[in-house]
């Protein structure tokens, strides 16, 4: 996907047009240009396990947004 120009960028509001979160809207947190994916706030949330560390001595779980293919989002005007 090198040298491909995308119509969305970080901070844009987009609507999910395909997949489990179809119809939801959110702000783009990151664009993964090499993979052709975006991370949208509040969409495709997965629970990830965290290993114990100095920051989190007990470890645990955290909800994290996962990447969505850029073809599955549409920019919302406004």
From Swiss-Prot:
Provide one Gene Ontology biological process annotation: translation
Protein's name in the database: Large ribosomal subunit protein uL24
Entry's family note:
Belongs to the universal ribosomal protein uL24 family.
What is a GO molecular function of this protein?
structural constituent of ribosome
- The reply to whether Ribosomal protein figures as a keyword in the UniProt entry is yes
Q: Which organism is it from?
A: Campylobacter concisus (strain 13826)
Q: So what does this one do?
A: One of two assembly initiator proteins, it binds directly to the 5'-end of the 23S rRNA, where it nucleates assembly of the 50S subunit.
Source taxonomy: Bacteria, Pseudomonadati, Campylobacterota, Epsilonproteobacteria, Campylobacterales
Gene name tied to this protein: rplX
InterPro entries assigned: KOW (IPR005824), Rib_uL2_dom2 (IPR014722), Ribosomal_uL24 (IPR003256), Ribosomal_uL24_CS (IPR005825), Ribosomal_uL24_KOW (IPR041988), Translation_prot_SH3-like_sf (IPR008991)
Q: Which UniProt keywords apply?
A: Ribonucleoprotein, Ribosomal protein, RNA-binding, rRNA-binding
Q: Where is this region: Disordered?
A: 52-78
A GO cellular component annotation here is: ribosome
CDD domains named among the record's database cross-references:
KOW_RPL26
Q: Which Pfam families does the annotation name?
A: KOW, ribosomal_L24
